[in-house]
Amino acid sequence: MKKFLIGIVILFPILAFAQKEDYIWLMGRENQTFDTTHGGGILDFNFTPPKASYHYREHDMFLTNSSMCDSSGNLLFYTNGCVIAGADDKVLENGEGINPGNAHNLWCVTYNDGYSGGVGNSLILPVPDSSNLYYLFHKRFVLYSNPQDAIFDKLYYTIVRIGTKQTLEPSKVLEKNGILMSDTLALGELVAVKHANGKDWWLITPRRNSNQFYIFKFTSQGIVDTFQQTIGILPDPQGEGLGQMVFSPDGSKLYRTYRYRPVMVYSFDRALGMFTQFDTIHFDYGNQLVGEIMCAVSPSNRFLYLSCRKLLFQFDLLASDISASQTTVAEWDGFADPFPTMFWQCQLGPDCKIYIVAGGDTRYYHVIHNPDVAGVACNVEQRGVKFQTPTGASMPSFPNYRLGPIDNPGVPCTATVSVNQPMIPIKDKPIWVYPNPANNSITIEYQAINGQNNQFLLFNTLGQTVRSVTLPQGQTSLQLPLGDLSEGVYWYSIPGLQNASGKLVISR
């Protein structure tokens, strides 16, 4: 029997080249010279673990929060919904006056706050086949004397050019507040997913309190097609702004949460740009006042997490009865500083961990360290990230920039294996699969457990069996070729045996 020891840090490669557009997260309030505890923050994923640091900034970050890095993880520009600023925090040429109107005048000018709205109110997409052009998509809020009459009435696009040494051109906003759609739109809920070709994008947002969606095709020519589709149930108007809408990392499912509604699940065809099926996941909110319901999906697409104020739930999306798989993986521990650090907005990080805003304007993010592990072993660390200043209840929303074409989707993030930690010897478990990540083949080492031939099964993230081989008695290892399988995350198991299942990453 072999015992393997990892003595170095291994970074799982996700593609043949770096894609680090989401490696810098910005949050926090504008600085006040008389109080350094009230200022900006940065979470930098170029460090392992990610580095949380103080950052002097004149721009307040709130619910409208988007940033963009280059492929090496260097910050290029960001927006708080009021202005567009560069990495030096200076407003880009023509970068002022984003989202014009009475909400801008009140929040951005009078109060010097960041732009409000719902979770996922803006996002940035790189222009396909361009090295320095980007589109910022963002929604405008219109205020009325009766706050309940306030609406999002426009979806805008703004084009940003980043200067390069080759062209000697300065970074500049080439066009701003171009009207992409005028309608009564949902609060936040602006998402994007790669086209099946792995290059173009689909941009999606619903109408307000509606099951009607606008779907836009974004290519190197800009927005080239617009579709409408009605599918599923109507959200409850009382839950407006208290949920989150996210794609699974592989882009096959869209999850939408609303108060007083089950989780709404939409199957999405990345080639056609349309929803093909609607389902729901019913769940128990627990013994607490029904409030916000935010969500995230694990890197392998296997587990859904619902962030519900005092409770954090996990669901197994491969279970025969998903609702019955509901598991409480964390409960708020009662900490407040000064506000209760409950569970709120979620975002999958580029390090394969899920980060959760801890309540409102506190100094913390919660962390799910192992989101692809079932049950409490997913390892939720409350207040796992502490900032020097309050976050302003702010967290950016990112699409999966690393998603590839439909036949080679890749993996959405880069996990880090800890150093100086011995792997479990074969004698302590019935099966060992290596190398992991794998390239074109794996070795399966196993022990005779039940005196009979066992079956080794390998599944893709859709739950489809892609390998089924017999592990004959009388030998202890078997070589399994994988050259025909696409890069990505897979799951293996030996039915009927305990501790005989796990995750396999194929990366070339």
What would you call each of these model-derived segments?
Residues 6, 425-434, 438-508:
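C-terminal outer-membrane/trafficking sorting elements
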Residues 4-13:
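Sec-dependent N-terminal signal peptides
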Residues 203, 245, 254, 263, ...:
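Hydrophobic beta-strand residues in large extracellular and virion-surface proteins
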Residues 14-18:
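Sec/Tat signal peptide C-region and signal peptidase I cleavage site
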Residues 417-427:
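Intrinsically disordered, low-complexity linkers and terminal tails enriched in Pro/Gly
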Residues 19-280, 288-418:
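Beta-propeller fold recognition
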